Regions:
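Catalytic domains that recognize anionic headgroups
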Residues: 1-345
Length: 345
């Protein structure tokens, strides 16, 4: 965001919400911009997923550790005290680039990048994903890359549903028998299926993370202004997590063979709170610094600490899948619409 963009949005906020609320929102947005500059050009941190041990890595997009912990009573493989991993990114594009490419590293650390250290692991990795930023990955560096969003996108849900991602992951596991399998679901990331009517996801194709033009932008601005509560948005966020566990994770665990399956995320989600927030159970205290959603390169702990829950999986053979993915070509305009619908534009 440029200074002019910030000034324009500030005027809109003050006009819509008044000097006090609008001014506070603009100050928070300015701080987020400062944190972005720090994360891009100075202080940042995290650990590559290829540094950790796993056979199947399940990526639940935007899933916080405390959100996953709320599922502990419903699924026996999810503990009350969720272990964590420090992600390389605070948004998907940063996570994809830093884990799978050399593109996002400055020259002083280029000798530590993924293609230097993890080329062998990547060559034995199948990546089945519904995240559009997989386009930044060199397909030849992987054993197999399946961009499910290209043919599995659902216009009614404004996202790629979890069941088709599971079907494609099971097909990849059975066909290629990869040493490593990454399965990247878009849920619990917005659009939140329980809030589509309220914010008009069914009427407007685009949404975003900051501002007030598209449905999710409207949601975050209303949260910033106190029109909608954190509890309401959190409830919708939790409902999306239940959706991906029921339709995605559960059938996956019953239809692949893996000694170590890890449930994790690319980054977290923040709701603009300033005080110290305690995760469920024995998790650490952390701040959100007045930041909303998941802007890239913002090195705050609440965005960078993600779940790292280990379990196992056994292929029952119950799920019947097609080996070859459907053929589909996505135009640039369709791709832009989908990026907007997921809050990236």
């Amino acid at each position: 965001m440029t200074l002019q963009d910030w000034m324009d949005e500030s005027r809109e906020r003050v006009t819509e919400h008044g000097v006090l609320t609008g001014g506070r929102g603009s100050a928070e947005a300015l701080l987020t911009g400062v944190l972005d500059r720090v994360g891009r050009n100075g202080y940042n941190y995290g650990t590559s997923v290829f540094e950790r041990e796993w056979d199947v890595l399940v990526v639940l997009d935007t899933c916080r550790p405390d959100l996953l912990a709320e599922m502990a009573g419903e699924y026996d493989y999810i503990p009350q005290d969720v272990p964590t991993h420090t992600s390389l990114g605070s948004a998907s594009i940063e996570w994809v680039k830093k884990n799978f490419t050399d593109d996002d590293y400055p020259e002083p650390v280029i000798d530590r990048t993924v293609n230097d250290n993890y080329a062998e692991k990547m060559a034995n990795t199948a990546y089945v994903t519904s995240n559009l930023f997989a386009e930044h990955i060199d397909e030849d560096a992987l054993l197999y890359l399946d961009e499910v969003h290209e043919y599995g996108w659902n216009d009614d849900d404004y996202t790629t549903p979890p069941d088709i991602v599971t079907e494609r992951a099971v097909a990849a596991a059975r066909e290629y028998d990869p040493e490593y399998l990454v399965v990247h679901y878009m849920q619990p990331h917005a659009p939140y299926r329980s809030m589509t009517d309220r914010y008009g996801w069914d009427e407007k194709p685009g949404i975003g993370n900051q501002g007030a033009t598209h449905p999710a932008r409207e949601m975050w601005e209303e949260l910033r202004a106190g029109v909608v509560s954190v509890e309401e948005v959190w409830g919708a966020y939790r409902d999306n997590l239940r959706w991906v566990i029921e339709d995605g994770v559960e059938p996956l665990l019953n239809n692949v063979d893996a000694e170590t399956v890890v449930l994790s995320s690319d980054h977290g989600e923040v709701f603009g709170r300033w005080g110290l927030q305690k995760w469920t159970g024995n998790g650490p205290m952390s701040r959100e610094w007045g930041t909303y959603a998941h802007p890239p390169y913002v090195p705050i702990r609440t965005l960078k600490e993600v779940p790292w829950v280990e379990t196992s999986a056994t292929d029952s053979g119950e799920l019947e899948v097609e080996t070859e993915p459907p053929k589909s070509e996505v135009s640039e305009s369709e791709r832009q619409d989908r990026l907007e619908a997921l809050g990236y534009v």
